[in-house]
Amino acid sequence: MTYHPKSDFIAVMMERGFLADCTDYQGLDEALMKGCQPGYIGFDATAKSLHVGSLIQIMMLRWLQKTGHKPITLMGGGTTKVGDPSFRADERPLLTPAQIDDNIAGIRKVFAAYIDYDSGAENAALMLNNEEWLDDLNYLDFLRDIGRHFSVNRMLSFESVKSRLDREQSLSFLEFNYMILQAYDFMELNRRYGCILQMGGSDQWGNIVNGIDLTRRVIDHEVYGLTSPLLTTSDGKKMGKSQDGAVWLNPDMRSPYEFWQFWRNTTDADVGRFLKLYTELPVGECDRLGALAGSEINAAKVILANEVTALCHGAEAAATAEATAREVFEKGGIGDDLPTLTLGAADLPASIVQLIVKTGLAKSGKEAKRLIAEDGARLNDAPLTDAGMMIEAGDLAAPIKLSAGKKRHALVQLG
């Protein structure tokens, strides 16, 4: 990218690695230079919490506000009833209105940690729900006034739809309507709130472009789209998942200690990149920390874990998590003679059952499986529920703790 931005927001997005594409860099840049501008990201309410995979979008909204603009978090109370088919292999299960409302209430909690809604400042954020304008739409009027602006040929060409059809997997008419509804959201946000920017992951490119085209055609306003990369770790894993499931942002679904441990276990090659994306440390410091090697990189991982946890759960929770980890892993707080199993690369992948036996926490594979089935086994203090879990080298970027009951523990590390 050779474009040299004038606005602080685009400069930050480029410098820290948030940008995958933009519909019009110069046009958006010039619009942002004119003063406080609203920009939004939509979040469908498919679960009671967002997970780490959504954190890059939340950080984009945070930077939008920090550079003087107005973030809008749009809750998909309406679109969740349809389901986004983008790059999904199957149709999402439909949720009831009560389930959607419960999910929105859960998701709402995390945003306040990152974005200011209550200061009364010009750039104070808005939280909106698209059911406000979608629930009362008249279907025939919508087809006549909005549907006529969409080409089915073009919609079929979008990669998010094309990939599904190429695999000969069903795409329901309900899901096919999702991109029209999301486009309508952008137009309504522009009409009601002057919103000029929609952001999202690169899988949302087609939906964003549809919204821009619809807004131009119907109300003749210029709006813009900006996408972030779909993030994977250096070993190709999808961001937001760990060996024991999704890394949720709400503390009642993933404890701050487990959240801290997820970041502490970052692969060496990802440290610098994640510091730029998920913290507010200066870029030069992120580069310096990311370039550390050997045992020194572990100090950078602790900084990463502390910074991200402090943003999400507060500085006190981050400090407590670090102290707990140090007590367990460094000071032997659960016994100075904590047994440690050191594995070589040739030993991996290894089954969790095999590791429980090798660490002496169970005498046999049968006993280890029974321990898991009876909720007596834990991995990094989280319940172990899958006896078929495999541990790979990437999972051992930092030592992991296995527990049997409350008093028997062991460490597994990569030698």
From Swiss-Prot:
Keywords tagged on the record: Aminoacyl-tRNA synthetase, ATP-binding, Cytoplasm, Ligase, Nucleotide-binding, Protein biosynthesis, RNA-binding
Motif ('HIGH' region): 45-54
Binding site residues for ATP: 241
Entry GO MF terms: ATP binding; RNA binding; tyrosine-tRNA ligase activity
Domain S4 RNA-binding: 350-414
Keyword Ligase in record: yes
Any GO BP annotation: tyrosyl-tRNA aminoacylation
Protein EC: 6.1.1.1
Coiled coil regions, renumbered to chain: none
Tree of life domain: Bacteria
Location within or outside the cell: Cytoplasm
CDD domains: TyrRS_core
Pfam families (alphabetical): tRNA-synt_1b
Motif ('KMSKS' region): 238-242
Catalysis performed (reactions): tRNA(Tyr) + L-tyrosine + ATP = L-tyrosyl-tRNA(Tyr) + AMP + diphosphate + H(+)
GO CC term (a single one): cytosol
Residues noted as binding L-tyrosine in the record, renumbered to the chain: 40, 178, 182
Function, in words: Catalyzes the attachment of tyrosine to tRNA(Tyr) in a two-step reaction: tyrosine is first activated by ATP to form Tyr-AMP and then transferred to the acceptor end of tRNA(Tyr).
PANTHER family (UniProt xref): TYROSINE--TRNA LIGASE, MITOCHONDRIAL, TYROSYL-TRNA SYNTHETASE
Family the entry assigns: Belongs to the class-I aminoacyl-tRNA synthetase family. TyrS type 1 subfamily.
Subunit organization: Homodimer.
Protein name: Tyrosine--tRNA ligase
Organism: Ruegeria pomeroyi (strain ATCC 700808 / DSM 15171 / DSS-3) (Silicibacter pomeroyi)
Highest classification ranks of the organism: Bacteria, Pseudomonadati, Pseudomonadota, Alphaproteobacteria, Rhodobacterales
